[in-house]
């Protein structure tokens, strides 16, 4: 199977998000890469489901709360930008202050 670099990046994000989901389900607090991966994967999946950029920008702020992540992580993540594939093409989604 031949994958483009973009496809490889998407699979890496998805794999990291699965790991983050499992750790969160076990009650562990997520670190920086796990938090970014989980939010990014949710945005990518929402885009595939047909949600709008505005919906995803809002939903991106509701995926994780301070109680879900290690101390200091919310301050480290000011913005998350992810290129997501929508039914009408690829668009950049920016989530400001994703962990409140």
Swiss-Prot record:
Localization per record: Cytoplasm
Predominant location: cytoplasm
Substrates-to-products reaction catalysed: urea + 2 H2O + H(+) = hydrogencarbonate + 2 NH4(+)
Pfam families per UniProt: Urease_gamma (PF00547)
Signal peptide: none
InterPro entries: Urease_gamma, Urease_gamma/gamma-beta_su, Urease_gamma_sf, Urease_subunit
Species the sequence originates in: Polynucleobacter asymbioticus (strain DSM 18221 / CIP 109841 / QLW-P1DMWA-1) (Polynucleobacter necessarius subsp. asymbioticus)
Protein name per UniProt: Urease subunit gamma
GO term, biological process aspect, one: urea catabolic process
Keywords carried by this UniProt record: Cytoplasm, Hydrolase
PANTHER family: UREASE (PTHR33569:SF1)
CDD domains noted in UniProt: Urease_gamma
EC number: 3.5.1.5
GO molecular function: nickel cation binding; urease activity
Pathway: Nitrogen metabolism; urea degradation; CO(2) and NH(3) from urea (urease route): step 1/1
Entries under NCBIfam families matching the protein: PRK13241.1, urease_gam
Name of the top EC class for this enzyme: hydrolase
CC terms in the record's Gene Ontology section: cytoplasm
UniProt family annotation: Belongs to the urease gamma subunit family.
Quaternary structure, from the entry: Heterotrimer of UreA (gamma), UreB (beta) and UreC (alpha) subunits. Three heterotrimers associate to form the active enzyme.
């Amino acid at each position: 199977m031949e994958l483009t670099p973009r496809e490889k990046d998407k699979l890496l994000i998805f794999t990291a998000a699965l790991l983050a989901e499992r750790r969160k389900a076990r009650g562990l607090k997520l670190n920086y890469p796990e938090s970014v991966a989980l939010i990014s994967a949710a945005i990518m999946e929402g885009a595939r489901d047909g949600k709008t950029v505005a919906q995803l920008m809002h939903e991106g702020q509701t995926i994780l709360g301070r109680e879900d992540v290690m101390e200091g992580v919310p301050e480290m993540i000011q913005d998350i930008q992810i290129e997501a594939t929508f039914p009408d093409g690829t668009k950049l989604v920016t989530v400001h202050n994703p962990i409140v």
